[in-house]
Swiss-Prot record:
Signal peptide: none annotated. F(1)F(0) ATP synthase produces ATP from ADP in the presence of a proton or sodium gradient. F-type ATPases consist of two structural domains, F(1) containing the extramembraneous catalytic core and F(0) containing the membrane proton channel, linked together by a central stalk and a peripheral stalk. During catalysis, ATP synthesis in the catalytic domain of F(1) is coupled via a rotary mechanism of the central stalk subunits to proton translocation. GO terms for cellular component: plasma membrane; proton-transporting ATP synthase complex. F-type ATPases have 2 components, F(1) - the catalytic core - and F(0) - the membrane proton channel. F(1) has five subunits: alpha(3), beta(3), gamma(1), delta(1), epsilon(1). F(0) has three main subunits: a(1), b(2) and c(10-14). The alpha and beta chains form an alternating ring which encloses part of the gamma chain. F(1) is attached to F(0) by a central stalk formed by the gamma and epsilon chains, while a peripheral stalk is formed by the delta and b chains. Residues 1-26 are annotated as: Disordered. The chain crosses the membrane at residues 56-78. Residues 1-18 have a biased composition (Polar residues). This is ATP synthase subunit b. CDD domains: ATP-synt_Fo_b. The keyword Transmembrane helix applies. Its main location: membrane. The keyword Membrane applies. Keywords: ATP synthesis, Cell inner membrane, Cell membrane, CF(0), Hydrogen ion transport, Ion transport, Membrane, Transmembrane, Transmembrane helix, Transport.
Amino acid sequence: MFVSTAFAQTATESQPASTAGEHGAADAVHTETGVAHDAGHGSGVFPPFDSTHYASQVLWLAITFGLFYLFLSRVVLPRIGGVIETRRDRIAQDLEQAARLKQDADNAIAAYEQELAQARSKAASIAEAAREKGKGEADAERASAEAVLESKLKEAEERIAAIKAKAMSDVGNIAEETMATIVEQLLGLTADKASVSEAVKAIRASNA
């Protein structure tokens, strides 16, 4: 088949036009994609630092602090207040009991001193009588008086030691109960009695 010169020239002239049209369409697509791409990026500001979000951020911050304050005032603070009030009552009871035990100890000491004074007076009178009755009888009576004095002294010391031991035992038990109550109220856990006892003993040993 032969192609005429006019047809070949027409085909050659129309080819650049179609090529230019294709390039124009591609550029248009690229331009539209670029616009969409740039629009997708937006302003590029980190949302927490964007001034348009300040109002909502302040609102949520106020709501969060309000809920936190409500939780503290309705749950945490009443529990702590109850524990402190219970501890205050226990301390008052401990002080009253300690005062009573101290009064008992003072009474026991006063009775011991009175008995000691009487025993010394009796020993002095026995010594005076020994000059008349003889040294042998005086020594025997003195030994008897000293034995009685020693027995009464030992009895008084045992009474005082028992009172002090009871006081320390009561204070230790109260401290263990109070610590267990505080742990249960604040942490919601049941404290092991042995662990609480060891902790109280360690504190008392460090303060001794």
